[in-house]
Design a protein with these regions (language model features):
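Cytosolic regulatory regions of ion transport systems
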Residues: 1-218
């Protein structure tokens, strides 16, 4: 079992999926929800599953919430509870609080009250789905900021058989190719003379607009 400890508050579809994945990856995870039925559903998944009111300061203290490395506020059906829980966690000295936002305004409030990271699962999933539907090349994306990402995509036909310097990705667009996956091999930090081949998977860092433009090339 790995050392990092997580607590997930709010066991809806997103929260439960998060608990499952973190547990699968070998981390200790405490699942917290006020709904006994939801907690019963995670008893066999989480390291610990506790029925508790996340807006009760004494309860959070008793759970040792400040000792967790990361606490994720995944409450989605009650914005007030989501915000108040986030405030309380920061006041209790939790090292890193990740909070789920329903919309942009909710996200701004969470940022103002001190959430270390604000996430938009529904929005991000919709964006990812839309990009996969309109592009034949798009595979995966990791958002680093609102404007920049690391994206994984198949080499567009127009870039195949060209060296990286010939593609102009870095010079013209400021896009950095971090790695190329070719069959079972991974070329990390490829040189400017490395030639792209049809079927190569490119892992690149750049602005969202530039990356989206590249993935939509024929």
């Amino acid at each position: 079992m790995k050392n990092k400890q997580f607590a997930v508050i709010g066991i809806g579809r997103f929260g439960e999926s998060l608990v499952k994945e973190l547990t699968r990856l070998g981390y200790e995870v405490m699942a917290i929800d006020i709904d006994e039925e939801k907690i019963n559903d995670t008893v066999d998944i989480a390291t610990h599953a506790v029925q508790a009111d996340s807006m009760d300061e004494d309860t959070l203290k008793a759970l040792g919430i400040r000792n967790f490395d990361v606490v994720i506020v995944a409450i989605g059906n009650n914005i007030q509870s989501n915000i108040l829980t986030t405030i309380m966690l920061k006041e209790l000295g939790v090292n890193k609080v990740v909070a789920k936002a329903q919309n942009a305004l909710h996200g701004k409030v969470l940022e103002k009250i001190g959430a270390d990271l604000v996430i938009y699962p529904e929005r991000d999933m919709a964006i990812k789905l839309a990009r996969s539907l309109v592009s034949n090349n798009f595979l995966e994306q990791i958002n680093l900021s609102p404007t920049h990402s690391v994206m994984e995509f198949f080499t567009p036909v127009t870039l195949a058989d060209k060296s990286l310097v010939e593609t102009g990705l870095r010079k013209k667009m400021g896009v950095t190719v971090l790695a190329i996956r070719r069959n079972d091999d991974v070329i990390v930090a490829p040189g400017p003379e490395e030639r792209l081949r049809k079927g190569d998977v490119i892992v690149a860092l750049g602005s969202n607009d530039d990356l989206e433009y590249i993935t939509n090339l024929d």
